[in-house]
């Protein structure tokens, strides 16, 4: 893999990544001769690099923006990448008899911004899996947009450890339990609060989500609600 940064500190500041990998996971030999390929380009138009972390815990004094796009492709007997080895999407399981069954192309476009306690980020994902056994193409599409803010930045009576956040996400995917030619749609609406005891290394999260599913095969809609309390410690 190669990576680097160009034009640091200018309006043309950017990072680049390109690599060729084993397409079946870490320490797992390929079943065939094909390798996974990827490229990523990140533009920092304000001349400041933005790390891949959510929430503006460090309170960026200057506005920091990143815009990026990436692509990855692989052909093999697995329909999804897994760090533990060959994986299969629902309805497109790993194939032990055809090493070249799935031709996969996927892309992502993303944007992120941080400034004085405000963090905004969004990603759009697209994936196509061409199945040689059936001659069919299956498309997957999804996106999310989320924002968080430490209101202590405008009201000092609010604890500086508290962040309030909102998230919206959707996924369009083949109906793996019915007709793979039909598309199901899942949506998520989440509001949450984070309490950062010691940055991302020690934090408590409380959130509420409203989840929906539009099932294409049954032509029915389903709804569910979820409340989650999580204490996250990492080191």
Residue ranges and their predicted role:
Residues 24-135:
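Surface-exposed beta-loop-beta
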Residues 14-18, 65-69, 109, 120-122, ...:
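Transmembrane beta-strands of outer-membrane beta-barrel proteins
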Residues 37-48, 147, 223-235:
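Outer-membrane beta-barrel "beta-signal"
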Residues 102-107, 114-173:
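A beta-strand-loop signature enriched in Asp, Gly, Thr, and Trp
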